[in-house]
Amino acid sequence: MALFDEVKEVIVEQLNVAPEEVKPEAKFVEDLGADSLDVVEMIMALEEKFEIEIPDSEAEKIQTVQDVIDFIEKAKA
């Protein structure tokens, strides 16, 4: 499964949005309707799924689906 699809799966489950709404450029708050708690829970789910640690300082910079993908790719490199 491609990284985007794995990330998308977590986002759809955590934010309860339709899969077609999850695009690389989609912003979690503005486009997907997430609030700050939703974002925190989503970050925690992503950390668990990909076995990575996303520090708070980095989590604050993650605004879009692509930001998550970029971070995971760097963390796994």
UniProtKB/Swiss-Prot annotation:
Q: Please, which domain of life does this record's source organism belong to?
A: Bacteria
Family membership noted in the UniProt record: Belongs to the acyl carrier protein (ACP) family.
One protein family per Pfam: PP-binding
Cross-referenced Gene3D superfamilies, in alphabetical order?
A: ACP-like
| Disulfide bridge partners, by residue number | none
Q: Which HAMAP family match?
A: Acyl_carrier
Q: What is this protein's gene name?
A: acpP
Question: Where would you say this protein principally sits, based on its record?
Answer: cytoplasm
Domain Carrier, by residue range, is 1-76
Gene Ontology terms describing biological process: lipid A biosynthetic process
Q: Does the keyword DNA repair apply?
A: no
This protein's pathway reads:
Lipid metabolism; fatty acid biosynthesis
Taken from the UniProt entry, a GO cellular component term is: membrane
Q: Where in the cell is it found?
A: Cytoplasm
Q: How is it modified after translation?
A: 4'-phosphopantetheine is transferred from CoA to a specific serine of apo-ACP by AcpS. This modification is essential for activity because fatty acids are bound in thioester linkage to the sulfhydryl of the prosthetic group.
Q: What is this protein called?
A: Acyl carrier protein
MF terms from GO for this chain are: acyl binding; acyl carrier activity
Where in this protein does the record say O-(pantetheine 4'-phosphoryl)serine is found? S36
Question: Which species is listed as the source?
Answer: Nautilia profundicola (strain ATCC BAA-1463 / DSM 18972 / AmH)
| Keyword terms, alphabetized | Cytoplasm, Fatty acid biosynthesis, Fatty acid metabolism, Lipid biosynthesis, Lipid metabolism, Phosphopantetheine, Phosphoprotein
The protein's role, per its UniProt record: Carrier of the growing fatty acid chain in fatty acid biosynthesis.
